[in-house]
Regions:
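Short, flexible, solvent-exposed loop/turn segments with mixed acidic/basic and small polar residues
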Residues: 34-36, 59-65
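Active-site environment of non-heme Fe oxygenases that use a 2-His-1-carboxylate facial triad
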Residues: 2-55, 105-264, 269-270, 275-320
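Short beta-alpha junction loops
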Residues: 77-79, 104-106
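Short, flexible turn/loop "capping" segments at secondary-structure junctions
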Residues: 63-67, 143-144
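N-terminal, charged low-complexity regulatory/assembly segments
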Residues: 68-77
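Short, conserved charged micro-motifs
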Residues: 80-85
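A short alpha->loop->secondary-structure connector
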Residues: 90-99
Length: 320
């Protein structure tokens, strides 16, 4: 995979995510699909010390995030259970504002593992059951959207636990190619509503309505909030929204060439701009020392250097 991003050039006043600007979109589309990673191996970067990346390591990780909104790092030695490496890695990419979600640890980084008892079996991430397609924090308030994520593997399960990823910009591209009206529907401010979260009769989070796709005003980059769950969501009841959701559901259930499948090994992790992902079911073997534990840090920040306004600069026409 090439580290170059110089093929993407257009006047700064245009946006490929403006549904009325077809030329800017086609220019961005050409760049996006050119040399796009075809497998998880294309996203992997070996690093010696995640707390102090070398310039070459940082560039390799960043270039993958610029193209695919994600990179996988691999550490060969060290203390994989050291939580500080998660925060330190994130800070080197401008990730600082942690989302202290409901089940986060005291340091706002979440230990994802099977939890027994109250709360554990209710929230699927803390079970060994499959976790359907979603972006993190899709239920958050508009000013607390999760834009960056670091997911670090301390130990893997005895069996299963594979993740599948899809770059949300690729999802945008495929939807727009199919029918721009699908995107217009999914960008409506009331396209998707998440019901209130109530525990023991107490509302701990109010209902949240918002778009599936939006464009960050500061960076010009697209953002996505989505869940494939059906019992925790209400879609706007209009034809284009239903058609768009149906197309997206079929895409995620299929075998698209853009789906990235990977089972994180101890010492590996993914840093991303909150791309679409799901998790397969898994089986732990505590007696054999194989218990799945991942650290998850969710940020209100986007990976610095991946902003559209940073990449989409200068004036250079697309080919043709």
């Amino acid at each position: 995979m090439s580290d170059s991003i110089t093929n993407l050039r257009s006047p700064a006043t245009t946006s490929p995510f403006d549904l009325t600007d077809e030329r800017a979109y086609q220019c961005w589309r050409e760049w996006k699909l050119s040399d796009y990673p075809g497998s998880a191996e294309d996203l992997i970067v070996s690093v010696a010390n995640p707390c102090r990346l070398s310039p070459a390591e940082k560039h390799a990780l960043l270039s993958r995030c610029q193209k695919a909104n994600a990179a996988i790092y691999r550490i060969s030695t060290g203390d994989f259970a050291n939580k500080e490496l998660v925060g330190s890695l994130g800070r080197q990419f401008g990730l600082a504002r942690l989302d202290r979600n409901l089940r986060a640890d005291e340091d706002s980084i979440t230990s994802l593992k099977v939890v027994s008892g109250p709360g554990g079996t209710y929230y699927i991430p803390y079970t060994n059951r499959p976790l359907n397609w979603h972006t993190d924090g899709y239920y958050n308030m508009p000013d607390e959207q999760v834009r960056g994520v670091v997911l670090h593997c301390v130990s893997d399960a005895a069996e299963g636990g594979e993740n599948v990823y899809l770059d949300h910009e690729i999802a945008y591209l495929l939807l727009r190619d199919e029918n721009p009206e699908y995107l217009a529907a999914l960008m409506q401010p009331d396209a998707m509503t998440i019901p209130a979260n109530t525990e023991a009769g107490v509302e701990i989070r109010p209902a949240q309505s918002g778009p599936v796709f939006s464009v960050e005003p500061r960076t010009g980059s697209p953002h996505m909030r989505y869940t494939a769950r059906t019992r925790s969501i209400a879609w706007k009841d209009d034809r284009n929204t239903r058609m768009a959701v149906g197309f997206l559901t079929e895409l995620l259930a299929g075998e698209s060439e853009f789906l990235i499948r990977y089972r994180l090994q101890p010492g590996e992790g993914i840093i991303c701009n909150n791309i679409l992902h799901k998790r397969e079911a898994f089986t732990d073997d505590p007696a054999g020392g194989r218990t799945r534990l991942l650290y998850r840090a969710r940020y209100y920040d986007r990976i610095h250097g991946t902003e559209l306004n940073t990449i989409w600069s200068g004036v250079r026409p697309c080919s043709g």
